[in-house]
């Protein structure tokens, strides 16, 4: 390689060398040979050449060596500092972020001027370390250097403030901007979506000029609604997006399919699947995974299996999604067979896969198999069980009536049990009439979620099942005394791509009178046939 460079001019030689590194090798020995050649030929006197080399080193995963090269450069300019800061900002390591801040401060110490490319990289560091005070310092420096009118820099500042909890600062910056392009609008929309401020996001979308809105604008709001558990509103905004003839992209469709899955909206979900097929987007693994998830959660596990078998490419998420779907539908044997098939295919299960397969064992009652799988997580796959895995084990043992063993598992956990763990034990105590454990589980639940009526009702029912009517009555009176109300039941139905939700005792539905008329007619017809 060195001989080949000698035949070229020095600058073109380095370009060829960097390109060759990307193609032929990225080991440290090759990089050091390159660096030696740069020093011998004097190429290292040009900061542009050194920046290219640092970029090649960081892309090859040798950032420590890249930083060493940077620190030995006698007169690094702004471009070289930017290259080093950018490389460090891409790493998800606290040490790298502190080094990036040091590099930025060296830029100031050398009296070199930061430019519009410096600040977005440094703001990413502020986001990574969640340091709003450092971010505010950068904001002040942006103003000092006159870059507060740069859309590129302001967008970075808005993203930083949202990520660090400074919502008011982000909105103030936005409102004070005289010229706003679509990227600034979208940065604010994405920020509101990220923190769940969906009313603000919706208001901003309505305020946004229609000629500025693009598919990213709509997607920010749709995705925000979907992640905030407001699936109906996500679908409503998606339908408006289509009415305005804005083409959804892959990210949009992922969010909408997620909303359909949460609502169980099979009719609309199938329409979106047809759209995906028609647009030739069904080769995207992430979309196929979302389609499988939508069918499984909407009750059509057969269709979910059909899609799974038809896809050309599967990753761990694909396998986990179908295993979880089978488990949820009570097909424990099929879920286990799918898990074994996944392992034979050479796909390594992850922590979510084990939640799905342990859930399948729980539904079927395979206690011994569940224990073996749980133990294999650490011994075979190097996965440390988290609280959800322990929750699956408590559920598995509780359903099987092994309540004392479940209690021992809770005591052995490396972290404190949460409400889901104690709730599972309380439910199992109710089924298997274990009053002692039931009372202890409720006492823990009252500390964690004192207003959850379901917990009190479970213990009240346990007292009733054991014929202890006074304690059952006392439990219900206790609920009234502390103001805990029984959660109203609810149901839903999908009609013409719209999901209607009904809540027990709710009088706010716009067609409540007509609903009660129909119910009375149905009641009369039922009574006439009895």
From Swiss-Prot:
The lineage of its organism: Eukaryota, Viridiplantae, Streptophyta, Embryophyta, Tracheophyta. PPR repeats lie at residues 77-114, 115-149, 150-180, 181-211, 214-248, 249-283, 284-314, 315-349, 350-380, 386-420. Disulfide bonds: none annotated. This is Pentatricopeptide repeat-containing protein At5g56310. PROSITE patterns: PPR. The keyword Cell wall biogenesis/degradation does not apply. It comes from the Eukaryota. Belongs to the PPR family. PCMP-E subfamily. GO terms for molecular function: RNA binding. Residues 421-496 are annotated as: Type E motif. Pfam families: E_motif (PF20431), PPR (PF01535), PPR_2 (PF13041). Keywords: Repeat. GO terms for biological process: RNA modification. Residues 497-527 are annotated as: Type E(+) motif.
């Amino acid at each position: 390689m060195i001989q080949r460079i000698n035949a070229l001019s020095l600058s073109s030689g380095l370009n060829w060398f960097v390109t060759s590194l990307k193609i032929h090798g990225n080991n440290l020995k090759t990089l050091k040979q390159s660096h030696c050649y740069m020093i011998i030929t004097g190429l290292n006197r040009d900061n542009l050449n050194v920046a290219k080399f640092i970029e090649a080193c960081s892309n090859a995963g040798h950032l420590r060596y890249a930083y060493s090269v940077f620190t030995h450069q006698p007169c690094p300019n702004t471009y070289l500092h930017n290259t080093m800061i950018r490389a460090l900002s891409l790493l998800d390591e606290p040490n790298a972020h502190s080094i990036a801040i040091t590099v930025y401060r060296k830029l100031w110490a050398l009296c070199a001027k930061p430019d519009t490319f410096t600040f977005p990289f440094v703001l990413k560091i502020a986001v990574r370390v969640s340091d709003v005070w450092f971010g505010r310092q950068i904001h002040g420096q942006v103003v000092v250097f006159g870059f507060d009118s740069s859309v590129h820099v302001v967008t970075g500042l808005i993203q930083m403030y949202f990520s660090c909890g400074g919502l008011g600062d982000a909105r103030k910056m936005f409102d004070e901007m005289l010229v706003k392009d679509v990227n600034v609008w979208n940065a604010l929309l994405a920020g509101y979506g990220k923190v769940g401020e969906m009313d603000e996001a919706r208001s901003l979308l309505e305020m946004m000029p229609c000629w500025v809105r693009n598919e990213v604008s709509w997607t920010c709001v749709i995705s925000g609604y979907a992640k905030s558990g407001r699936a109906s509103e996500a679908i409503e905004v998606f339908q408006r997006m289509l009415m305005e003839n804005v083409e959804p992209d892959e990210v949009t469709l992922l969010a909408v399919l997620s909303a359909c899955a949460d609502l169980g909206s099979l009719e609309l979900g199938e329409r979106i699947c047809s759209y995906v097929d028609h647009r030739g987007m069904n080769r995207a693994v992430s979309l196929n995974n979302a389609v499988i998830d939508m069918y499984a959660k909407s009750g059509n596990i057969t269709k979910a299996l059909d899609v799974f078998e038809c896809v050309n490419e599967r990753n761990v998420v694909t396998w986990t999604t179908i295993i979880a779907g089978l488990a949820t539908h009570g097909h424990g044997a099929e879920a286990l067979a799918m898990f074994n098939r996944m392992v034979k295919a050479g796909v390594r299960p992850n922590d979510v896969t084990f939640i799905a397969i342990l859930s399948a064992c729980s539904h079927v009652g395979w206690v011994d198999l569940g224990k073996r799988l749980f133990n294999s997580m650490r011994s075979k796959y190097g996965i440390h069980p988290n609280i959800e895995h322990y929750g699956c084990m408590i559920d598995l043992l509780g359903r099987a009536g092994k309540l004392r063993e479940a209690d021992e598992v809770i005591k052995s956990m490396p972290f404190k049990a949460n409400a889901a763990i104690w709730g599972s034990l309380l439910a199992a105590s109710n089924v298997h009439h274990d009053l002692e454990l039931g009372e202890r589980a409720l006492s823990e639940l009252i500390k964690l979620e004192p207003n959850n009526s379901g917990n009190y009702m479970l213990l009240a029912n346990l007292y009733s099942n054991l014929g202890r009517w006074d304690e059952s009555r006392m439990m219900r009176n206790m609920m009234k005394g502390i103001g805990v109300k029984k959660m109203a039941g609810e149901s839903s139905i999908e009609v013409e791509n719209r999901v209607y939700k009904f809540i027990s005792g709710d009088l706010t539905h716009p067609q409540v009178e007509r609903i009660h008329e129909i119910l009375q007619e149905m009641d009369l017809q039922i009574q006439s046939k009895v």
